[in-house]
Amino acid sequence: MNTNNNVYTIIYTTLIVVVVAALLAFVSQSLKGKQEANEKADTISQMLTAAQFGTKAEFQKMGNAAVLAKYAEEIGQAFTINLDGQKVQDLDLEKVFSPKELKRQNYNIKGGANKTGEPEIPVFIFKDGKTVVPIYGAGLWGPVWGYIAFEKDLKTVAGAYFDHESETAGLGAKIKDDPSFQAEFVGETPDFTSANVFEIVKGGAPKDAEGKSLVDNKIDAITGATMTSGGLDAAIDTWLGAYAKYFQGAAPKQHCGNCKHEGEGHDACEGEECDHEHQAEEE
């Protein structure tokens, strides 16, 4: 064959392209399983960190298998809800929501042209009573997301962990890298009746002598990262707003001290009455 003509050049180039494409596809497929496993373990470690079972650094040292084992040991139940706070379906306890899945649900919550269906957002309840929910939104340069854990009362924040794709190192990236920023959320009680469930603002709320916030739901914004702080604030407001009806409905009711359902969730007295008040009247 004449190697100097155009036909040879075209055939040769086509073969090279096909071979290289096949090799790239093979490598990509070979790595896909490992990438998915790493992503799942990372997501779980974020949830465990928010729920105060350890630090992100500690989970990174443990390895994927140990992280999954810890999660299996601590998780109690998982399910999805709609915006009315009603359960849609139970989730396999091994199921987690990747940032890509959170992005899709973010579109569904907000509505508009990118909506793919009705919102179906996850709730993760651990055996110690903490409830963890995700948040997702836009930072300055890319998406930001994270997890917020609540105590049994479903009002008080037990912990939080945030992550990002490409925020500025030393500035916006502090939502992930600065534990003191995440620690500010602990003990706060978001306002589920307001559009501003949390407010991340410069200066935050006034503090007492021990550095504790004197006003609930106000967090000090990161200095030099106004756009990232604002984006995270909007993400938290959007997602916790989407969970508002669930939290308000599932929060433990204030029963009398002698009620057998004291401290339990909203389904505790379903189908029966708490008659302690009537007993007290008879006495």
Predicted regions and their residues:
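Flexible, solvent-exposed loop/hinge segments and secondary-structure transition points
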Residues: 2-260, 274-283
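Cys/His-rich microdomains that often coordinate metals
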Residues: 263
